[in-house]
Amino acid sequence: MVKGLELFEVPRQVVFGPNAIGKVSEVLTYLGLRRGLIITGHIHSRHIASKVSEQCVDCQIISDDEIELSDVVKGMSAFSDVDFIAGVGGGRVIDVSKVIAYKLNKHLISIPTVASHDGIASPYISFLMQDDLNKLGVGKVRKTPLAIIVDTGIVAEAPRVFLLAGIGELLGKKVALMDWRLGHRIKGEDYSESAAMLALSSHMIIMNNVNKLTRHGEEETRIVVKALLGCGVAMAIAGSTRPCSGSEHLFSHSLDLLAREYGVKQAMHGMQVALSSVIMLYLHGANWRRIIKIMKMLGLPTSFKELGYDKELVVEALMNAHRIRPDRYTILGSNGLTREAAEAALEQTGVI
């Protein structure tokens, strides 16, 4: 069958490596950007944001906790005359920046200070933030960064737990791709070979560098950043998160919703994805033991108990996971797992 016209946006300029933060002025000049709104966090990322502001012609800095999602939905008209929105910080900062850039129809510059997730380069925001926006009447947020600047020296200074979360995110891509192919074969879902290969390449970057990643430095940070950037571009090409988000993410999202409902502290996204991948590889009949071995080598948690979740919450989340995105077919099927099947998978893999 002949496909119709395809259109996707990818970042126009990507700069990463030591001292990349010093290239902000050069990037902005190249892109013709002058006036900007910089969204950032506190202390460390605020300091980095100041370095970014010094290289702008006219930039204002505000903290993400000063911004309510309801304000963003109303439009933030006070900033309608800026050329770009820059996110300088972690996951929430980058997500808030995407939402503002999307609502104001402005260019987005992504300047992450941690490498904990693939949102640093993708057009999409976190599941929970999108869920909150849906309740406010906002549709699917999609905003591809025009430029991405990652100073690997700065990212390497962040606590190792953030890098481990990024690695955990990348370990899950194998499952996402297996599920995507399954959905393509069984439900006729659109499938992009180029996006799939890019996501697989990102996964393999981690698998091929496990021994190196037992260390923590700029070189190891660069490996993870490069893989996360590849995932972001894969999602942009596919026009969805499908190349990088399968049943392992459905389970993680289900955990997030239940944790919020029951008032349980949520674990880091990448940690949940890594553990969820073990379960889904088991269900696929794939080599889940290899992932557990890698997680132990790198110091990632290998049980949900380590993440602070009790057995009942985890079982319930696994049983509900298929309901998160019913439009996406995965190894969980249309009806999900029975309690017996969920408990068996958790016990057989030893993650409970």
Curated annotation (Swiss-Prot):
Similarity section: Belongs to the glycerol-1-phosphate dehydrogenase family.
InterPro entries attached to this UniProt entry: G1P_dehydrogenase_arc (IPR023002), G1PDH (IPR032837), Glycerol_DH (IPR016205)
Pfam families membership: Fe-ADH_2
One annotated GO biological process: glycerophospholipid metabolic process
Enzyme Commission no: 1.1.1.261
Keyword vocabulary terms for this entry: Cytoplasm, Lipid biosynthesis, Lipid metabolism, Metal-binding, NAD, NADP, Oxidoreductase, Phospholipid biosynthesis, Phospholipid metabolism, Zinc
Positions with a binding annotation for NAD(+): 91-95, 113-116, 122
Cofactor names: Zn(2+)
Subcellular location: Cytoplasm
Pathway named in the protein's UniProt entry: Membrane lipid metabolism; glycerophospholipid metabolism
Main subcellular location of this protein, as a coarse class: cytoplasm
Organism: Caldivirga maquilingensis (strain ATCC 700844 / DSM 13496 / JCM 10307 / IC-167)
Binding annotation for Zn(2+): 169, 249, 269
Cofactor binding: number and manner: Binds 1 zinc ion per subunit.
Protein name: Glycerol-1-phosphate dehydrogenase [NAD(P)+]
GO cellular component, one term: cytoplasm
SUPFAM superfamilies assigned to the protein according to its UniProt record, in alphabetical order: Dehydroquinate synthase-like
Oxidoreductase as UniProt keyword: yes
Encoding gene (name): egsA
